[in-house]
Amino acid sequence: MRIILSWFLVFGLILIGHGQTATILSKEGKVPLESVLLHSENPNIQGITNKNGQVDLSPFMSAEKIDIRYLGYKPIIESYLSIKEKKFIIYLEEAGITLDEMVISATRWQESSKGIPSKIRTISKSDMQLLQPQTAADLLGISGEVSVQKSQQGGGSPMIRGFATNRLLYVIDGVRMNTAIFRAGNIQNVISLDPFTIEKAEVIFGPGSVMYGSDAIGGVMNFQTTTPKLAIDKKWVAHSAVNSRYSSANREKTMNGTLHLGSPKFASVTSYSFNRFGDLKMGKYGPDSYLRTFYVDQIENMDKIVQNINPRVQVPSGYYQQNVVQKLLYKPNEKWAFQYGFHYSGTTAYSRYDRLIEVNISGVPISAVWDYGPQIWQMNHITVSHLGKNAFYDGLTLRMAHQYFEESRIDRNFSGSNRYRLRTQVEKVNALSINIDLKKTLKKGILYYGLESVGNKVSSQATAKNIQTEAPILVADRYPQARWNSYAIFGNYQYPFSKKYIAQLGIRYNLFNMEADFSRNLAFFPFAFKTTNIQNGAFSGNAGLVISPDDKTKISLNAATGFRAPNVDDMGKLFDFVSGEVVVPNIDLTAEIAYNGEINLSKLIGNSLKIDLTGYYTYLQNAMVRRATTVEGKDSILYNGKMSKTYSIQNAAFAEIYGFHAGFELDLPLGFYLSSRYNVQIGKEELNNGATTNSRHAAPAFGLSTLGYKKGKIHLQFYSVYSASVSYENLNEEERQKPAIYAIDENGKPYSPSWYTLNMKGMFTVFKSSTLNIGLENLTNQRYRTYSSGIVAPGFNAIIGFFVLI
């Protein structure tokens, strides 16, 4: 019966289309494939299939070579005439394991990974549909190659190759998300992205500054979100989808609805998601020091220490979030495309859990209140694309974007002079960016080049009040009022010496400047300056070589530099990172520079085994680090009601990171498969006295191993995630000062224990257009913290989700 229905579907699709409409199906199940990419160099045009696997081939009538690619399937090359002879029905065969996939991160253009010397990890839509990550931070974690730190449940700060926070770059639909207030401390901006709207995520490891600019030192995380789908027939089509999910560990309730509308030239997609995350429950078996035995609550207008009825429930850690995405596409012909995108993300306030569990020497909580206010991100984004052969380019993409960021911090001490002072610090950033990306195929090789302009306006305001009298209290702003600008020109040339050797060479020059006004804080601190202007520039470059002795072997060598320009957070921030110690502004900063070398080996053995090996070394020069300083000749100032020792961010250190990645994928008979990924990163950074300590953001060795089964309507995975320990002796010097987030060893010293989880996920096609997801995470109910995290990871977690396509 299934075979008969499949063939009825095939013939039905043929009848729906017209003579020049091709239908692309999977060879195994005869299922239509959506978002298959078709590309021709002559004529220079592209096409993409709709949800019925259909694409209009009339623009390809003169094409002798049409490259047809789809993630997870073997690429094929056909001519228009050969497709016509097949009556416009094309079958794609599942690739299983391959060295070739389409990526966009390396050059900002979609291309085959075969000619790219950098290591890139792709997280596909099918991975996300099976594993059901709650947030975009969790999405990165399922890669098995990115370690994620969480200070609180509403968190997620990736660590890649020993770097994190503002030494990593986030890119959404080709637009940089990093702003002038991305800090060296852990950040959680990535949770603003909605996993339901992410079509694909790519992580490029190592410096990516040539194509992406400042901050791309440890890596670049490139997220491609949902796009509108055009219709093939000369009429409007519509379809919608609904996702729902429940998770037991935090009583998550998530709903998503998506609506697609399309005609041959105009299309729209609308998506809305709502997440309700309750207080997170930790596991049963693990260190007792992780238990949440108390919390602070106000009872009759007095702060009270309340005994937690269930110490495994982390109170308070829950929050709500909603996301909206709206995109419009107008494509008048095969050469031009105009797209508008709108993104909105907003959370409720959520507690910074790692601060709420801190106690003083007497065991009394330090904070009564420590919350992040609502985190808001909004982006308006216009993209203009043109395909056409001329003297300057074969392809051009213009991106213009405006982003608005809002974040806040709300804190009050449990005791002392500030126990009644409720302080609120609000930061707002307006970011404008323009990117022009061009691609030109030359007689020998391809040139990728472009221009970038980025501007940030930072507004910072702090207020406080006495909670008993409501009287206002004057407090210092976190940042000066500031502007940060960056202008760049770049180029990257890919030259094939032969089929076996491909070289790549790139260069970028970046000019940046920063203006800051400290007037609002002069009443609090005797700075010797009122305003400041910093201007500097930086070159970056890369050189790579890909060697392919045969179709089943890829060896790549890559050398690259990266840089991070000082931003407003580095230069102008005023905050207390530890009680009694405060960071003050420094107007003499310059860019830090990274030098990286790596070697990658990918090898197919037969048609069923793939091995990946990578080794790398990175040296960071002029690293911006926290160092002791003086203000008006004094080493301490009065801040937050107490005399505090002064520090500033300075170009005063070096750091070095080295490590390796090893992984394999194995196809087994009867639909089974096996894979494993393991990562080791070792880092050193210079201390104030010239000695070194282990790098704060070099996570302990970690990995992911998976046994899966995929056949027909069933996809199952049993997998384990695991991490090595970090002893007190190997713990970063700064991390040693945070005993609240670490376990205690037999000598009474903080350390990070090793841990593992066992997990199961299943996805079942219940009907033709609906799927059921079932998951069981942390089956052995381990109580563990990922490295450097404040929140304890979930204990046993049962997940059920349902997807319906209408």
Regions found by a protein language model. Name each.
Residues E28-G29, V36-E41, R69-Y73, E85-Q129, ...:
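Short, acidic, small-residue-rich periplasmic hinge/interaction motif at the N-terminus
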Residues S498-K499, L511-F512, Y616-Y619, Y639-E733, ...:
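Gram-negative outer-membrane beta-barrel transporters
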Residues I3, K331-S345, P374-A523, K530, ...:
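Face-selective signature of the C-terminal outer-membrane beta-barrel domain
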Residues N250-F277, P287-Y350, I376-Q378, F497, ...:
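Transmembrane beta-barrel wall of Gram-negative outer-membrane proteins
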Residues T348, V359, Y404-S408, A464, ...:
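Surface-exposed extracellular loop regions of Gram-negative outer-membrane beta-barrel proteins
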Residues I90-Y91, S192-A241:
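A beta-strand signature from Gram-negative outer-membrane beta-barrel systems
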Residues V55-S58, M177-P207:
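Short acidic/polar hinge/loop motifs at secondary-structure boundaries
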Residues Q425-D437, S486-A488, V584-T590, N596, ...:
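Outer membrane beta-barrel strand-and-loop segments of large Gram-negative receptors
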